[in-house]
Each structure stands twice: as structure tokens, then as C-alpha cells.
Amino acid sequence: MIIDRIEVRRVHVPMKSDAVASASFSGDRGASFTAGLDKHIISVYTDDGLVGLGETWKGTPDLAVRRAAQALLGRDPLRLSLLRLDLPHDPAVINPRDRGEVVAVPVRSIVQNPATHGFEIALADILGQAYGVPVCQLLGGAVRDRVLVHYWSGRRTPEDLGAIAKMAQEQGFAGLKIKCARDDPHYERARAVYDACGPDFRLTMDPNMRFDTIEDTLRIGRELEGLPIEVFEDPVPKDDLDAYVRLRDELEIPLALHLEHPQDVLAAVARDAADMFNLRGTMSGFVQTGYMAEVAGIRVWRGSGLDLGILDASYAHACSVVASCTLGSDIVGNFLREDDLIAEPLVYEGSYVKVPAGPGLGVVLDEDALAKYAVDQGDDGPGSWSIDTTGSGK
């Protein structure tokens, strides 16, 4: 089996109106979540008729996608490692998130091509089809057929957030993750959520490190004592593990770190710096760090970028494999974006998303929707292009 053609289509699918934040927080960095952050839908074709689908993280540079595609053309997908997918990488070619331009994250050296996620999914889709099994089987085998998910919201007024939480609960969701910052009305927001949904509704607060200091985090945490907050995620800079150790010692509210790299998970476990992890990365990378968390006795969830259907399906497959993934993942892009670009949406039952049955990824592109949201111009050329083994392309 040989990869004989790769087609890439750049798309922009906006968030639904008012899906992210209250009007008073519309100027918050990252509030639009899609402006200037296009995605790529990848179709990888083989010489025996299989087609694998992939989706990049928002904002992945065109150059990274093109270099990855060129490296895979002519390769046998049955002889590639999903765990160690070695694609050409220029450390200067990274997406805006990893430069700290979307959310406040520590800027660090990126060790792989940022398009790796998208191509890993497409290759896994091909392998699953070739072997007649769902992608989760390639990742180690599912331990569950559905994955717990929680709804998501950006920064909102207490009144708006209470209404959003109630709407989510009425749709079956058991919890909500919210974005926040140091000087927001935290108690009033949380009180509005619990007044609307009751004390069993789960609430995750994620300031993207914008509680700033240990002292401010302690102040906010003590203000919320007595309310059943599930977790503070990344309250302060996450490279300061000393701060997390102290906060865990002094706060009643559990703490989570949002991590990707195995060495960071090892360091956090060694310091006993977190109660929970929000893990990101490729499918195989998530399974790897999820196993590490399981050995350490730490529960995890899978973070997202409020993505489209292909990435969300990949998250469901990966989460189904990791026994420690028992917290609510935010696999809810199709509730918040105008379209998911797949023919049949993922199936949600209560606060769970069903793992697609496969074979492969188990989703099909909606070509009409793809055409509707296509972007004509990319970073350095047309928004849509393809290459093949004959040397032709467009």
C-alpha cells in the first residue's frame, strides 16, 4: 500500500453567534476562538482506494502542512509508527497558540511538526479501514464505548453563565468548563451556576494562568470555599510547580495542570503538584501520557480547541482507550461552531459522546459544508491544493 495522493483544503468555520462569551467580555484575547485561526481538512489517498481523513489544530501554518504532506507521499502507511511519526519540522514554523498569541501559555520549544496531529488521524483512519477495526483498537483497545463530556463557555456575566449552564444541563450535560481571569466575579458566577443547576453540577474554572499569583489564587479559592467547584485548571504559570505544591497544601479546591509532553507529566507527578490533568497532544501522545497518569493514580480529561468533527472523533477514540480519562472532556465543537464538516454528527447521549464504531475513524466528510467554509487563500498560496506521486499538483 502506497500513499499516492494528498489533498488539503483550508477552512474557516466560525463560532455560532454568542457561543463564546458575554458581550462585555468580547474583547478578551481568544474570545472569538477562530479569527485568523483557520484549519486544514486533509484527505490522504492510497493506491488501493482507501482514504484517510485528518484535521489540523486551528492556526497550523500552511508550510508545516505542506512539508508533512511531501514527506508522506509515496510512503506505505502500514509501515509508519503513529507514536513516532517523524515529519519535517522547523522550530520557527509553529501555530499562534504555541507562540502564546491565543491564550497565555509559556512559550517553549516545539518538538514536532504542528501538522502531526492531522496526519496522524488520517493515517490511523487508513490503518483502521485496512484492518477492519476502529481507530481506538489501534491505540490499545477501548475500555469504554462512550466518553464523559462537559459543556464549555468563555467568560460571561453571572446571569448569562447561569442561563448557559441551565441550557447545557437541559441538553444532558453534567458539567461545564468556564474561562475566567483574576478580577472576574467568581463567586457570583459559581453561585448562578449552582442556583440554576443544583450542587451536583460540575464546574471547572480555567483562567489560563490568569489568576497570576499564589496570593490571588488563594484569595479566589477561599472566596469560593463551600461551593462544590470541581477543579481550578492552570490558575498560575504552570512551569512554577512550587506554586502548585503550595496551593494544593492550602486550598480545598483541587488543582489541574494542562500538559502535553511526557516529561512535564513526569515532573508534575514527581512533585505531587496536581490532583488532575487536562492532557492534549496527538492521539497516541494522549494515550501515552494518560497511561502515565493512570500509574500515578491521577484522573484526566482531554482538552480541545472547540474543534470540528474529525478532530472530535479522534478525541473520542483516544479517550476511550485511557482508563484514567474519567473527567469531563470538552469534546463539544459541534455545539459551538456553525458546522462540524462531517456528514453525520457524533452521537451524544446525556453527558456522553459515543465512540464512532469505525472501521477507521468512523466519520465521512460533508463535501457541501466543506465547500461552504473553504478559504480561497492560504499563508503562501491557494487555500486548497493537492500533490501526488506523478509529480503533478495544484
Segments and roles (model prediction):
Residues 1-48, 53, 57, 71, ...:
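Structured beta-strand/loop patches that form or line metal/cofactor-binding pockets in enzymes
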